């Protein structure tokens, strides 16, 4: 186990998460008692208590007053906020994790973009207008791409879509900085944003589904060609 956290709390959090991931503390089992665990990790009980509360909020653990702390099956109890942690824990699965992330984005965006165009076209156009001023480099495009999908999600009038995109932000933008280093990817994205703006202006809601699906397919092809050169910083390092 290699832990790169700098603070005691960060170290304790990584130690426990990696122990759950590696089945040292398997799902469904009980964590060691607080005193034993704090000595094992080398942190104070106060620090450990704070870490356990945070891990419980993220779905890794279940804490019940007067009962031992239980290790959860995090696939069933955690949310999108653990995506970056999963990427750090299992480097070999990062490409599949990102494929799944982008597939979800495409599937739900066909719904919320169409709804945004139908119900709040002015707001949607305002979101898409940012594409007219983006600088031609990877960081700017990664930020723009995230803000456009997030903005259109909230413009749909259903904030749950926006919260889902929020939950993807860390891994999404890290992936975007690598993907948009490719000029072909930036060109494809600009064409997509401009096409969406045109559809919104024309009220052509029925064409949104096919436009988004096509972009998902074409951008996916570029991404798959780039996967063999994934940078190490796609996974979060310790705190």
Swiss-Prot record:
It comes from the Bacteria. Disulfide bonds: none annotated. Homodimer. Residues 6-74 form the HTH gntR-type domain. One of its GO terms (biological process) is fatty acid metabolic process. CDD domains: WHTH_GntR (cd07377). Its main location: cytoplasm. Gene3D superfamilies: GntR ligand-binding domain-like (1.20.120.530), Winged helix-like DNA-binding domain superfamily/Winged helix DNA-binding domain (1.10.10.10). GO terms for molecular function: DNA binding; DNA-binding transcription factor activity; fatty-acyl-CoA binding. Multifunctional regulator of fatty acid metabolism. The keyword ATP-binding does not apply. Residues 34-53 bind DNA. Keywords: Activator, Cytoplasm, DNA-binding, Fatty acid metabolism, Lipid metabolism, Repressor, Transcription, Transcription regulation. It is found in: Cytoplasm. This is Fatty acid metabolism regulator protein. The lineage of its organism: Bacteria, Pseudomonadati, Pseudomonadota, Gammaproteobacteria, Enterobacterales. GO terms for cellular component: cytoplasm.
């Amino acid at each position: 186990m290699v832990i790169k956290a700098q603070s005691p709390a960060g170290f304790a959090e990584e130690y426990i998460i990696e122990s759950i991931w590696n089945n040292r503390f398997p799902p469904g089992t009980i964590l060691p008692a607080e005193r034993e665990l704090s000595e094992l990790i080398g942190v104070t009980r106060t620090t450990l208590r704070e870490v356990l509360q945070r891990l419980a909020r993220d779905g890794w653990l279940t804490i019940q007053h007067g009962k031992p702390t239980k290790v959860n099956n995090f696939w069933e109890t955690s949310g999108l906020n653990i995506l970056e942690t999963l990427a750090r824990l299992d480097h070999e699965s990062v490409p599949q994790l990102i494929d799944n992330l982008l597939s979800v984005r495409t599937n739900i965006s066909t719904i919320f973009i169409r709804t945004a165009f139908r119900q709040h076209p002015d707001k949607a156009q305002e979101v898409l207008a940012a594409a007219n001023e983006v600088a031609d480099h990877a960081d700017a495009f990664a930020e723009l791409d995230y803000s456009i999908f997030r903005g259109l999600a909230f413009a749909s009038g259903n904030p749950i879509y926006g919260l889902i995109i929020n939950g993807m932000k860390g891994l999404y933008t890290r992936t975007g900085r690598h993907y948009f280093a490719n000029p072909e990817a930036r060109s494809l994205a600009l064409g997509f944003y401009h096409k969406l703006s045109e559809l919104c202006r024309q009220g052509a809601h029925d064409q949104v589904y096919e436009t988004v699906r096509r972009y998902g397919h074409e951008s996916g092809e570029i991404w798959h060609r780039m996967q063999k050169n994934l940078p190490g910083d796609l996974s979060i390092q310790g705190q």
